[in-house]
A protein has these predicted regions:
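A general boundary/transition motif marking the beginning of the first structured unit of a protein
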Residues: 65-68, 84, 100, 104, ...
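Short, glycine/acidic-rich beta->alpha junctions
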Residues: 2-3, 108
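Structural motif
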Residues: 1-2, 22
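Flexible, polar/acidic helix-loop-strand segments at domain edges
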Residues: 8-88, 92-95
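C-terminal solvent-exposed extensions
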Residues: 101-165
Length: 165
């Protein structure tokens, strides 16, 4: 788990992340503590840690609501990984580790990082679990489609789906 300060620090650590902001993101929440002000122009932007956090938190204005935000977050993660891979990964991991809450030891993470030699962020595939956005009492919920999730998992692992009908 990485908290807000960890996101800011990790993004700043790699010199920002370049993303294509799909539209002008503008939002104010004076009740947040501290108040949240988002104003990010549309187009390709190099986001520092503070702006990256705002980009990741923004949820209004996407045609497909929260799913749009998830897609934007996935785009951001790919761009951040691509940027981080251009650095000496062990030094980035060591510095970022203090911002990560995990039960995985630093040495285990560094060993796993060794598997990333020659890895390209272009090979990252992302998925959104099948389901349906459902509003309820002014809140938005995402109801997972168990059958769809099972079929996706089977597909990803090259297995045949089994109908229980």
């Amino acid at each position: 788990v990485v908290d807000y300060q960890g996101v800011i620090a990790c993004v700043d650590m790699i010199g920002g992340v370049e993303v294509n902001v799909p539209f002008h993101m503008e939002y104010t929440d004076i009740y947040d503590d501290p108040p949240l002000y988002i104003d990010i122009p549309a187009g390709v932007q190099l986001l520092d840690g503070e702006e990256a956090l705002k980009f990741l938190r923004y949820r209004k204005g996407y045609d497909n609501q929260d799913l749009g935000r998830i897609e934007a977050q996935q785009q951001f993660i790919k761009a951040a990984v691509k940027k981080a891979l251009g650095f000496q990964l062990p030094s980035v991991i060591k510095e970022a580790y203090s911002y990560i809450e995990t039960n995985i030891s630093m040495s285990d993470i560094l060993n796993l990082a060794g598997d990333l030699v020659g890895f390209s962020a272009d090979n990252i595939e992302t998925y959104i679990l099948p389901g349906m956005e459902t509003p309820l009492e002014g809140l938005s919920f995402y109801i997972p489609d168990k059958e769809g999730i099972r079929n996706l998992a089977y597909s990803l692992y090259g297995l045949n789906t089994i109908n229980n009908d």
